[in-house]
Amino acid sequence: GIALLREAGLPLCLNTTFTRHNAADMERIVSFAKENGIPIRMTSYLFPPLRCGREANESCFLPPEEFGRLGAAFDSLTMNADQKKRRAELLAQIRQKSPALPDRGRAASCMAGRGAFWVTWDGRLLPCGMLPKLGAPLKEAGFSALWAGFGEKMDAQRLPGACSGCPRRILCPVCAAVTQSADEPPEALCRYCGSYMEAMARMRENGAD
């Protein structure tokens, strides 16, 4: 399938999510992407299945600390020298507890509700598949009307205060979909960031970067 997409001249990017079942394949996945000249991104955090109130399948999840180590290893494999230097400078800034950058207070840094949307199986339009409460049935208002209101809805979302002012905010993948709350910070992501920073520091000390 990938070969056919490339032959057709279509832009291609690999998005990977690592779980207990494929974490050991990370180096091979990255090697495949490099050998074929395909950009690759890693997602190490699995969102809880919010839409139907289902319990998360813990058999797929890795502990936040392991996600952090995987994230550091992935970045070490995929970043060039300049990117690694900038990342080291960023981590040093975080350790000095510099304040978060002003634009990092947004509750979602992705394109949800601004350049991307979801349509559910039952015809609801959502700005993000993990924010079902912000959606509405397409039959009631139509796409244009619902889409026009998504930007305002996303801007109204708020992160917990501890997240908005956290020095790690520039590194952390936290967003409104992760927290589902304007009060409680996601403790798992705090552990993820700590593990990531420790792993990057160890690799730098050992000359792995």
Residue spans for each PLM region:
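Flexible mid-to-C-terminal extensions adjoining Fe-S/redox cofactors in radical SAM and related proteins
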Residues: 104-107, 129-209
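Radical SAM enzyme [4Fe-4S]-AdoMet core and its adjacent flexible, acidic
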Residues: 1-113, 118-126, 130-135
